[in-house]
């Protein structure tokens, strides 16, 4: 049932009669209250983006819940939301979260979006080994050790954090889309064997040596703006590269790239 973007709909109490409802989207509405959720204990998918929802304890009757979107809300009582065992997808971006301990037992998570919060510690995710998509961009994360067991991970965004050590990524060979924009990264060596990466964003770091990227033969898009790169020779054999940004680097010579098929598209 999709009743999103219906701002004049305030009373949802009638939904209590639909106890077998499997999917509900009330995003971008402003319900007077959310107590009706307690009766919808067969819900598998629930979207409440920007609704004013706060009290996560109201979801504890939803034992079948697999997909949850509570983005753009100021959540509270996170510690009282314990029915998370079946969750596969959680969107909680722009929620001003400072911790995510409520996800401790969410071991079936495949999709997690925590973009733009205030999170420093993501160690609680160490058992989410089936994760395919993870966005923790725009937080305050330094330690990504917990990611090393996420062998299924394909897409990750760590942009705008304080990550320096990429070692936990070195065996995540399914990665194809990696966003590391605006961190404090110096060493790219952990990426050198992640051969299926096709999109890589590394702008605004402290990178000097591109040698580890020379083996990423499937790279199609690479952005390296605002680093400390002087030598781009390691990129010369990346034959599939279609987009390359090298602005704001002290590069001495780009002539080695002139033989590349898409050279005319590149900006340096």
Language-model region placement:
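Conserved catalytic-core motifs of eukaryotic protein kinase domains, centered on the activation segment
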Residues: 257
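Acidic, Mg2+-coordinating catalytic modules of nucleic-acid enzymes
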Residues: 37
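Concave beta-strand-loop units of leucine-rich repeat
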Residues: 1-10, 14, 20-32, 42-54, ...
């Amino acid at each position: 049932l999709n009743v999103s973007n219906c701002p004049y709909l305030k009373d949802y109490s009638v939904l209590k009669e639909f106890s077998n409802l499997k999917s509900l989207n009330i995003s971008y509405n402003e319900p007077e209250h959310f107590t009706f959720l307690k009766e919808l204990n067969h819900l598998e998918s629930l979207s409440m983006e920007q609704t004013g929802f706060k009290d996560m304890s109201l979801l504890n009757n939803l034992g079948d819940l697999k997909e949850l979107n509570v983005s753009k809300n100021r959540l509270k009582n996170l510690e009282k939301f314990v029915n998370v065992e079946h969750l596969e997808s959680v969107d909680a971006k722009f929620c001003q979260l400072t911790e995510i301990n409520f996800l401790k037992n969410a071991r079936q998570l495949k999709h997690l979006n925590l973009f733009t919060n205030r999170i420093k510690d993501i160690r609680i995710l160490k058992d989410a080994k089936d994760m395919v998509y993870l966005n923790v961009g725009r937080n305050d994360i330094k330690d990504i050790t917990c990611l090393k067991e996420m062998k299924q991970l394909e897409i990750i965004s760590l942009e705008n954090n304080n990550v320096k050590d990429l070692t936990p990524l070195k065996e995540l060979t399914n990665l194809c889309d990696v966003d590391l924009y605006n961190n404090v990264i110096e060493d790219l060596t952990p990426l050198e064997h992640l051969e299926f990466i096709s999109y890589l964003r590394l702008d605004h770091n402290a990178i000097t040596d591109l040698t580890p990227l020379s083996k990423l033969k499937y790279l199609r898009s690479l952005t390296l703006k605002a680093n400390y790169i002087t030598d781009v020779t390691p990129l010369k054999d990346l034959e599939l590269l279609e987009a390359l940004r090298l602005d704001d680097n002290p590069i001495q010579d780009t002539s080695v790239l002139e033989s590349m098929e898409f050279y005319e598209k590149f900006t340096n």
